[in-house]
Amino acid sequence: MAQFTSDGLALAYDEFGPADGRKAIVLVHGFSSNRYENWKRMGWYDAIAGKGLRGFALDCRGHGESAKPHDPARYDREAMAKDVFTLMDHAGVERAHLLGFSMGAHIALTAAMNDGGRIDHLVVAGVGGKIFEPGREPDSMAKAMEAASPDEIGDPMLKSFRHFADEQKEDRLALAACSRGPRSTLTRDALLAIRRPTLVIAGARDQLAGPPQGLADAIPGAKAVVIPGCDHFSMIAHGLFKASVFDFFDGWLE
């Protein structure tokens, strides 16, 4: 495990693939997950290295082996987006592809709106048209993380996130703080600022994301791919997810 410091927090990351790779890529995982579970275990490290790319995957603040403050103010979405660029600075990388899943997709979109010039291709997965719809009660995810037992959680989606957090042995109070962190609403007008080649991917059965085309339509020139038969979680390991990403990088989906 390697570390870098961002905003006073020690954040863990992995580097993989050839150090002199033709291009770099940064991977940003989803809520309650970590770099190992979201990417390495699902075969992404090997796939990226096999494509000759220099890869980086970080544990977002509050997750995995990174620092886990319990103060919601430390999870400002803008700050979490800056963590991506701080990792790139630490590694001496000026530009990179950026791939984010679920929460990581929100972070990647924020990064692209703030400093898109450092991003080559942008891929956001596990998100779709529902990004523009009112979500669950704002504090519901935090309360699910704070519940004494998953049995106290009525909402099936929230319960699944809680079970996953328990399986990963994550710090549930840090996750609760993360879910309460300040963030700007992603609007269609705001997304017009993204001027990088963008791909939106979601599973056909992803009830959390909704159809990816609904988000792609809001980003100039963006493409959308639906992974058949997959829900929010099962698409991560699907071969078509990987194939779509690499085809996009190689220009086949342009």
Pin down the residues of each PLM region.
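Conserved alpha/beta-hydrolase "acid-adjacent" motif
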Residues: Q207-P212
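Conserved acidic catalytic loop of the alpha/beta-hydrolase fold
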Residues: E78-A96
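Catalytic active-site module of serine/aspartate enzymes centered on a nucleophile-bearing elbow/loop
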Residues: P228-E254
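Short beta-strand/loop motif that positions the catalytic acidic residue
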Residues: I194, V200-A202
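Conserved HGGG/HGGXW glycine-rich cap/lid loop of the alpha/beta-hydrolase fold
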Residues: L9-A67
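Flexible "cap/lid" loop of the alpha/beta hydrolase fold
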Residues: H106-P150
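Hydrophobic, aromatic-rich cap/lid helix
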Residues: R162-T187
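Conserved alpha/beta-hydrolase "nucleophile elbow" surrounding the catalytic nucleophile
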Residues: H29, A96, G100-S102
